[in-house]
Regions:
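Short, conserved loop/helix-junction motifs that constitute active-site signature segments
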Residues: 143-148
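Twin-arginine (Tat) signal peptide motif
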Residues: 10-17, 186
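Extended, subdomain-level signal for the structured scaffold at the beginning of enzyme domains
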Residues: 19, 38-141
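N-terminal secretory signal peptides
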Residues: 1-13
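N-terminal export signals
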Residues: 17-39
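A short alpha->loop->secondary-structure connector
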Residues: 167-179
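Residue-level detector of conserved catalytic or cofactor/ligand-binding positions
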Residues: 178-188
């Protein structure tokens, strides 16, 4: 075990007991003995997971909620918990540069990043009702979903289609779940 062990030691747990605990947890979950070492490593050397946040037909309410959160604050979240690789609204870059940053993050962290999507996804007329960099947002989301380790639909629009999918639904808005055809959502 390397790294900062102060959290573990502050609770009166020494290295040996901690490794025993990890081994017991791995055995309880039916995992290999190697998993115990991996658990210990991930606890003592936490890495900030890369996050790619794509907004579709949205009001930016989910981003506003994130910015106004008090625990954790957006500063703590972005500087200590996650590595926010792409968020069109919060990015310092714009135009071609922000799209290049997103493309680079998709390639660099393929299979490792968490994809967060807010907003419903318009499918009518080939998705022309929500375009980013000259392409329908649906294409951006499908491409990002292919390489994601995990996908999170944030807010009612992304989770259920929201207001845009209600009633007349002129843009053919759908939820993220409908778009990527996951049969059953996984809840923490």
């Amino acid at each position: 075990m390397t790294g900062d062990n102060t959290l573990i030691h502050s609770h009166g747990i020494n290295r040996r007991d901690f490794m025993k605990l990890c081994a017991a947890l791995a055995a309880t979950m039916g995992l290999s003995s190697k998993a115990a070492a991996e658990m210990a490593e991930s606890v003592t050397n936490p890495q900030r997971p890369p996050v790619i946040w794509i907004g579709a037909q949205e009001c930016t309410g989910c981003t506003e909620s994130l910015l106004r959160a008090t625990h954790p604050t957006v500063e703590n979240l972005v500087l200590e918990t996650i590595s926010l690789e792409y968020h069109e609204v919060l990015s310092a870059a714009f135009g071609h540069q922000v799209e290049e940053n997103k493309h680079n993050a998709l390639e660099k962290y393929k299979g490792q990043y968490v994809l967060v999507v807010d907003g419903s996804i318009p499918l009518k007329d080939n998705g022309i009702y929500c375009m980013v960099a000259g392409e329908p947002i649906v294409d951006h989301i499908r491409k990002a979903a292919e390489g994601a380790a995990a996908i999170i639909a944030i807010g009612s629009c992304s989770a259920w289609g929201g207001v845009a999918a209600a009633g007349v639904n002129p843009t053919g808005a759908v939820s993220l779940l409908s778009l990527i055809h996951i049969s059953e959502p996984t809840r923490p």
